[in-house]
Structure formats: structure tokens, C-alpha cells
UniProtKB/Swiss-Prot annotation:
One GO BP: response to ionizing radiation
Subcellular location(s) per record: Nucleus
The family this protein is said to belong to: Belongs to the RAP80 family.
GO molecular function, one term: zinc ion binding
Chain intervals for the UniProt region annotation (Zinc-finger-like region): 505-582
CDD domains on file: AIR_RAP80-like (cd20912)
Recorded name of the encoding gene: UIMC1
Zinc finger residue extent: UBZ4-type: 502-529
Signal peptide start-end: none
Post-translational modification: Sumoylated.
The protein, known as: BRCA1-A complex subunit RAP80
Low complexity: compositionally biased ranges: 195-205
Assembly mode: Component of the ARISC complex, at least composed of UIMC1/RAP80, ABRAXAS1, BRCC3/BRCC36, BABAM2 and BABAM1/NBA1. Component of the BRCA1-A complex, at least composed of the BRCA1, BARD1, UIMC1/RAP80, ABRAXAS1, BRCC3/BRCC36, BABAM2 and BABAM1/NBA1. In the BRCA1-A complex, interacts directly with ABRAXAS1. Interacts with UBE2I. Interacts with NR6A1. Interacts with ESR1. Interacts with TSP57. Interacts with TRAIP.
PANTHER family found in the cross-reference section: BRCA1-A COMPLEX SUBUNIT RAP80, UBIQUITIN INTERACTION MOTIF-CONTAINING PROTEIN 1
Length: 719
């Protein structure tokens, strides 16, 4: 496709643009940029090729820039450190110059825009200032000054430093706006600027501006001078730049920063202005800043005083109360003793009361004590009944004895005190249960405990003879409670813990009192002969294992095999054990012949039948570990018998030895089993004599073969 480039037209357009730029100086830089951009535009006939050409130009530009960067990097790499340092200094100087030049250009543009806005807004400002009065103090007179001189405004903006315009925002051409305020004069009609150090006034025609505002404010708050000055800004929403204003105060009064309606109307009309607040923040309109600061200071003082008062209250420490000690629920008389002590304290406070009042108090206290004991007795008996009913199991027989104790204590409520009945219940309950702090509830095996009939007989024998003793204990308790509380607790502990209240150690199966069982358990290393203490989980697992073994025995009854030595039927499980025992008996008793073997087999069969009759008794005697071992060994033995056709020798289990073999045979078999166990059947290489392979010759290898193999490996890895 043909392409045409119109450079002549572009040159003429650029000349026209330069003429227009001379007329409008504000848009020179923008139009120059446009002119430079237009110079690179290529016009073509086809519309579809324009984006492709633009993309090609961009690619070429990026390539050129990348090449230039690469060349610069190469040059920098070839330069020495001193040359690189000098180049960095030059670069930083250039950047600083560019930044400074940009700031200067922005300041010049701002000044020009402000001057143009002042020239455009001058007539409206003049009319507003003519119709607007200013409120002054009572002793001063308000004067108005019409600002019609344009040179004065230009001089004002020349005096304003450029730092005030840096934070201003320009938008939509309306960049800034300033209005001259009329000046309030006192009887002296001269305009005088404020000096920061003293309150004197210098006669001059220059007005006061915002750059002196902070100093004059600080001076006015410190001491009241005759003539002060304040710049009062106003709030208005919109965009624009800084709004500057100065107000000169009156003679005798303090300074007044009063807003005017005309200013607000003018601001709302023009819009696009941002007013900056100088001095106190959040000062409302129409309020004296001095009074406002005094209010803030007063609030701060009140706040500090309230803080100090609150901190003083925090320093007062509160006294600690009496310690709360744990008590067993069975000791009712301790509670009664505490009630008596509290009542005695109250009596000590009111010592001036008469004897009649004391007697009445004692009677009321006795009635309260009786009602408390009855209520506590009933509630404790009910709660213990519920707990015991929940905790008793069908396999144990101690639940009946506990219920019988509860019934007897309820019948003997008149003679026996409530503390003793509750103590008896807790003692029996401690036999049933271990302490509650344990994670699982551990129950005692019923074989080690007394039956229900024996407990009834013992209590019937003890109860009539021990009533007098219990009454004596109660009298001793009542006497000692007031004097010494600790001795009373010891007496109750001794009376409640009877000789039968002993806990058996689960390791060595020895009985100890509850106070010594913990110390003994810490150092006990003994092994228990029988599992007398079983948890609920252990009992459940034990019952499951017993039921499983019983089912297996019932299934295996039908599987009997004939022994060809003694010609008797032997169950399938114990066949191997029976054959081995018969062989040993035949070797040992060669003179007896088949008679001795027949006796041995008859004894074996009798013991096996006894084992089938009482599987539950065996389950009680054996522990959980033995039952699991028996199950696992039965399974492994069955698998071995099915797999082996030649009937190799099998290690018998301890349960099978108990049921099928005599004691003499057990001793011989245990020795044989230990010697011929699979663990000890393995022999080390050095001790192997009957082996077909000579391991010693295999171990010694020639060093040359090793080196060759290593070399071969290395060659293989290389390839």
C-alpha cells in the first residue's frame, strides 16, 4: 500500500501554533508538546494499518532505549570507581536542578493565576466591602476603607512568600481568590503591623498577613496588649487554594475575630476555595479564642484532678478473707461447731445483753441445729442411696449390704447420731469405690469381700454393744469442738475409719489403710498373683474373652482324634500335647508298659473334663493378659496344624498344659519348650557345625576381586 507523508502541512500548522502561543502565554508548554507529538504521526490511506504502524514505532523505540541502556551499562562497567562516583554526582546535580526548575515554574504560574483572578474579582469585592460594616469593641469606632487601588493588591501578592501556595490545589481554571478586608481603625488612623517581641506599633502603610498570625496569637494569650491582631479564617466546602485575610483589633478590648455575612455569601457564590485554620483547632465561629482556650484548660484541670482521685482510690489495698479449707461431707459436727463459733462471736460483740436473751438464743440455736442435722441426714442418705444404686453391678454382692446398712441406720436414727450413720455409709462406700480423683472407677473383686449375710450378722452383734461408746464419742466431740477444732477432726477420723476400711495394693495384693496406701504405692514393685482389682473395661473384655473361649470349646468338643498309643479319644487341640506326653511316659516307664500310659491318658482326660465344667472359675483366676495370650496361641496352633501335614512339634500354651497334662509332665515340658523355643533355635554362623554351606570360606574374599568390581562399577557409571 502506498504511504504519503504530509510534512509541509505539519510545518505550516506548527507556525500557526507558534503565533497563537505568543498571544496565549499560559498554554505554551502544552501546545509545544502536542506539536512535537504530531510531528511523528504517519498518515496512511488504509485505516487497518494505523495500529500496526504505531505498534511498530513503539517496538523500535523500546529497542532503541534498551540498546542505549545496554551501552550505558557497558560503559559504566568499564569505568573505574572514581569515574563512576563523578558520574553519580553529575546525575544527582542534574536531578536537583530539574526539581528546582519545576518548583520555580509552578510558583510563577501560581502568581500569574492569582494576579489574574484578583483583576477579575476586583469590582465585586469593592461593592461587597462598601456595604459591609465590621463590629468592633465598645470603646472603638468602626471605619471602612475602600480598596480601589490595583497597585496595592499587586504589592500585597508580591510580599506573600511562595511557601503559602505550595499546599494549594488548582482546579478548572479558578485557581485562587483573595479578598481584601476593610481595616478597623482606632482613634489613630494609621495602619501599624504587629511586632513579635513587643506590643508597640510601627507607623507604616503595610497590612498584616497570615505569616505573623501564630506569633501574635501566642502573644495575645500570654498577656493582653492594647492593640492585637488576628487572622480569622472561615469554613467553606469546595475546591481552590489558600484564602488569606487579616483583621486588626481595637484599642482597649481584647482582640475579636468576628465573621461577616458578606464573606460567607461571597465564598458560597464563588466556590472552589479552601480556608486554613490558624491557632486553636475546632474553634467555633463567633467565639473568642482566648475564652475558648480557657475553657479547654479548665476541662484539662478537671480531668487531671479526677484522674488523681481515681489513682488514690486504687492505692487502698483490700484485706484478705479467711482461707477456705476443704471438708469431708460426713463431718456434720464440724459445721455445727462453726455455727456455734460464729454465734459466740456475735455474742461477744453484744456483751451488754441480759441472761434472758442469751437463753433464748441458745434455745433457737439448738432448734436450728436439730433441724439442720435432720435435713442433712435425710439428704445425705438419699444421695448415697442413689449413688450406690447407680454404681452397683450384677456381678458384685456388696450393693445389697450397702442397702441393708442404709435401712438399719434409718431405723436407728433416734439412738445413733447422724454423723456415725453417714460415716458407716461412707466407709462401706470407700470399700466399694476407690477415691473419686482416679480417672476410672475401680471396683474390688467380690471374692475378697464379705457376703451380705455376714455383714448383717456382724452389724447386729456390734450395734447393741456400741451404742454407749458412740454416745461417749459424741459427748467428747461436743466438749472439744469449742476448745480445739483439730483434735475433734482427728477423733472423728479415727471413729469413722474402722479396721475393715483398708485398701488392697493392686501390685502386691496387700491391704493398707487409706492414709498409707499412697505412700506404699509409690515404692511398690511387687507383682500381683491374681487380678483382684479390675476396672469395668477389664471386666467387660474379660467376659467377652470368656464367652469366646467357651464357644470355641463347645465347637471343638465334636473334633476328637484317636491316640494310637493309648487308644483313647483326645480333642483336636490337645492331640499333639497328649501324644508327646504318652511318648515320654513310655520312655520313662518302660517296665509298666501300656498301663502307665493309660493312667496318664485317663488323668489327662479327667482334667480336661474338669476344665470344660468350670470355665468361669478359670476365667476368674486368670487375668486379662493370660486370656488374650491363650486366644492368640489357640489361633496360631490351629493354623499350624492345618498347614502342616507331617505333624511337626508344636509349643503348647500354658492353658493347655493346665488342662491336659499332669504336674510332672508340665515340669518336663517346660524345660523342653525353653530349650527348643524358636528364638533359641537360631545359631550364629561361627557356631554352625552341621550346615552344608561353609560360611567361613564365603566370608573371606580376595582383595583383587573387590578392586575389580569397583573398577567395573566406575566404568559403568562413566558410560
Amino acid at each position: 500500500m502506498p504511504r504519503r507523508k504530509k510534512k509541509v502541512k505539519e510545518v505550516s500548522e506548527s507556525r500557526n501554533l507558534e503565533k497563537k502561543d505568543v498571544e496565549t502565554t499560559s498554554s505554551v508548554s502544552v501546545k509545544r508538546k502536542r506539536r512535537l507529538e504530531d510531528a511523528f504521526i504517519v498518515i496512511s490511506d488504509s485505516d487497518g494499518e494505523e495500529p500496526k504502524e504505531e505498534n511498530g514505532l513503539q517496538k523500535t523505540k523500546t529497542k532503541q532505549s534498551n540498546r542505549a541502556k545496554c551501552l550505558a551499562k557497558r560503559k559504566i562497567a568499564q569505568m573505574t570507581e572514581e569515574e563512576q562516583f563523578a558520574l553519580a554526582l553529575k546525575m544527582s546535580e542534574q536531578e536537583a536542578r530539574e526539581v528546582n526548575s519545576q518548583e520555580e515554574e509552578e510558583e510563577e504560574l501560581l502568581r500569574k493565576a492569582i494576579a489574574e483572578s484578583l483583576n477579575s474579582c476586583r469590582p465585586s469585592d469593592a461593592s461587597a466591602t462598601r456595604s459591609r460594616p465590621l463590629a468592633t469593641g465598645p470603646s472603638s469606632q468602626s471605619h471602612q476603607e475602600k480598596t480601589t487601588d490595583s497597585g496595592l493588591t499587586e504589592g500585597i501578592w508580591q510580599l506573600v512568600p511562595p511557601s503559602l501556595f505550595k499546599g494549594s490545589h488548582i482546579s478548572q481554571g479558578n485557581e485562587a481568590e483573595e479578598r481584601e478586608e476593610p481595616w478597623d481603625h482606632t482613634e489613630k488612623t494609621e495602619e501599624e503591623p504587629v511586632s513579635g517581641s513587643s506590643g508597640s506599633w510601627d507607623q507604616s502603610s503595610q497590612p498584616v498577613f497570615e505569616n505573623v498570625n501564630v506569633k501574635s496569637f501566642d502573644r495575645c494569650t500570654g498577656h493582653s496588649a492594647e492593640h492585637t491582631q488576628c487572622g480569622k479564617p472561615q469554613e467553606s466546602t469546595g475546591r481552590g487554594s489558600a484564602f488569606l485575610k487579616a483583621v486588626q483589633g481595637s484599642g482597649d478590648t481584647s482582640r475579636h475575630c468576628l465573621p461577616t455575612l458578606a464573606d460567607a455569601k461571597g465564598l458560597q457564590d464563588t466556590g472552589g476555595t479552601v480556608n486554613y485554620f490558624w491557632g486553636i483547632p475546632f474553634c467555633p465561629d463567633g467565639v473568642d479564642p482566648n475564652q475558648y482556650t480557657k475553657v479547654i484548660l479548665c476541662q484539662l484541670e478537671v480531668y487531671q484532678k479526677s484522674l488523681k482521685m481515681a489513682q488514690r482510690q486504687l492505692l487502698n489495698k483490700k484485706g484478705f478473707g479467711e482461707p477456705v479449707l476443704p471438708r469431708p461431707p460426713s463431718l456434720i459436727q464440724n459445721e455445727c461447731g462453726q455455727g456455734e463459733q460464729a454465734s459466740e462471736k456475735n455474742e461477744c460483740i453484744s456483751e451488754d445483753m441480759g441472761d434472758e436473751d442469751k437463753e433464748e438464743r441458745q434455745e433457737s440455736r439448738a432448734s436450728d441445729w436439730h433441724s439442720k442435722t435432720k435435713d442433712f441426714q435425710e439428704s445425705s442418705i438419699k444421695s448415697l442411696k442413689e449413688k450406690l444404686l447407680l454404681e452397683e453391678e450384677p456381678t458384685t454382692s456388696h450393693g445389697q449390704s450397702s442397702q441393708g446398712i442404709v435401712e438399719e441406720t434409718s431405723e436407728e436414727g433416734n439412738s445413733v447420731p447422724a454423723s456415725q450413720s453417714v460415716a458407716a455409709l461412707t466407709s462401706k462406700r470407700s470399700l466399694v469405690l476407690m477415691p473419686e480423683s482416679s480417672a476410672e472407677e475401680i471396683t474390688v473383686c467380690p471374692e475378697t469381700q464379705l457376703s451380705s449375710s455376714e455383714t448383717f450378722d456382724l452389724e447386729r452383734e456390734v450395734s447393741p454393744g456400741s451404742r454407749d461408746i458412740l454416745d461417749g464419742v459424741r459427748i467428747i466431740m461436743a466438749d472439744k469442738e469449742v476448745g480445739n477444732k483439730e483434735d475433734a477432726e482427728k477423733e472423728v477420723a479415727i471413729s469413722t475409719f474402722s479396721s475393715s476400711n483398708q485398701v488392697s495394693c493392686p501390685l502386691c495384693d496387700q491391704c493398707f489403710p487409706p492414709t498409707k496406701i499412697e505412700r506404699h504405692a509409690m515404692y511398690c514393685n511387687g507383682l500381683m498373683e491374681e487380678d483382684t482389682v479390675l476396672t469395668r473395661r477389664q471386666k467387660e473384655a474379660k467376659t467377652k474373652s470368656d464367652s469366646g473361649t467357651a464357644a470355641q470349646t463347645s465347637l471343638d468338643i465334636d473334633k476328637n482324634e484317636k491316640c494310637y498309643l493309648c487308644k483313647s479319644l483326645v480333642p483336636f487341640r490337645e492331640y499333639q500335647c497328649h501324644v508327646d506326653s504318652c511318648l515320654q511316659l513310655a520312655k520313662a516307664d518302660q517296665g509298666d508298659g501300656p498301663e502307665g500310659s493309660g493312667r496318664a491318658c485317663s488323668t489327662v482326660e479327667g482334667k480336661w473334663q474338669q476344665r470344660l465344667k468350670n470355665p468361669k472359675e478359670k476365667g476368674h483366676s486368670e487375668g486379662r493378659l493370660l486370656s488374650f495370650l491363650e486366644q492368640s496361641e489357640h489361633k496360631t496352633s490351629d493354623a499350624d496344624i492345618k498347614s502342616s501335614e507331617t505333624g511337626a512339634f508344636r509349643v503348647p500354651s500354658p492353658g493347655m498344659e493346665e488342662a491336659g497334662c499332669s504336674r510332672e509332665m508340665q515340669s518336663s515340658f517346660t524345660r523342653r519348650d525353653l530349650n527348643e523355643s524358636p528364638v533359641k533355635s537360631f545359631v550364629s554362623i561361627s557356631e554352625a557345625t552341621d550346615c552344608l554351606v561353609d560360611f567361613k570360606k564365603q566370608v573371606t574374599v580376595q582383595p583383587g576381586s573387590r578392586t575389580r568390581t569397583k573398577a567395573g562399577r566406575g566404568r559403568r557409571r562413566k558410560f
